[in-house]
């Protein structure tokens, strides 16, 4: 999907958490990016719903990476009696896997984190666990 010559394109980056959970990180990287943002969605909202935000920020030089929660969108998992998870998996496995993918896809860019609703809360919780989680 193209967002225009100046804004870059959308790419799906495969990510695997340390426990084997696989999902895709949606990336919108403009040609002259100055910083990167790992965006954590609200509870129950698939990453793709934030593509308009990613396009707008890319137009201002921000490489945007949209995290996908377990059980939504590109995640291989779906909650059920035999498959559940909690904040521990999100904060210590999935978000760090996305952070590593961002660092690999956008080396040298200043890194920031943010989110919508529960995503913002979990971004703050991640910083509580690792004060350098979103640092350059």
Feature roles, as predicted:
Residues 34, 42-45:
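Active-site glycine-rich loops that stabilize anionic/oxyanionic intermediates
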Residues 47-49, 54-80:
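Conserved alpha/beta-hydrolase
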Residues 38-42, 68, 116:
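The conserved beta1-alpha1 loop
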Residues 106-117:
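Alpha/beta-hydrolase fold nucleophile elbow
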Residues 84-105:
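Alpha/beta-hydrolase active-site loop
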Residues 132-136:
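A conserved short beta-strand
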Residues 1-29:
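N-terminal cap/lid segment of alpha/beta-hydrolase-fold proteins
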Residues 120-131:
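Short glycine-enriched nucleophile-adjacent loop
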């Amino acid at each position: 999907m193209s967002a225009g010559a100046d804004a870059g394109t959308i790419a799906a980056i495969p990510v695997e958490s340390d426990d084997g959970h696989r999902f895709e990180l949606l990336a919108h990287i403009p040609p002259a990016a100055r910083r990167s943002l790992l965006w954590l969605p609200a509870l129950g909202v698939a990453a793709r719903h934030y593509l308009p935000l990613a396009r707008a920020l890319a137009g201002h030089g921000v490489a945007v990476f949209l995290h996908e929660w377990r059980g939504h969108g590109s995640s291989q998992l779906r909650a059920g009696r035999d498959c559940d998870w909690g904040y521990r998996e999100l904060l210590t496995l999935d978000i760090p896997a996305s952070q590593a993918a961002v660092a690999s896809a956008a080396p040298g860019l200043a890194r920031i984190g943010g989110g919508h609703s529960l995503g913002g809360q979990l971004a703050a919780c991640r910083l509580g666990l690792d004060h350098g989680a979103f640092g350059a």
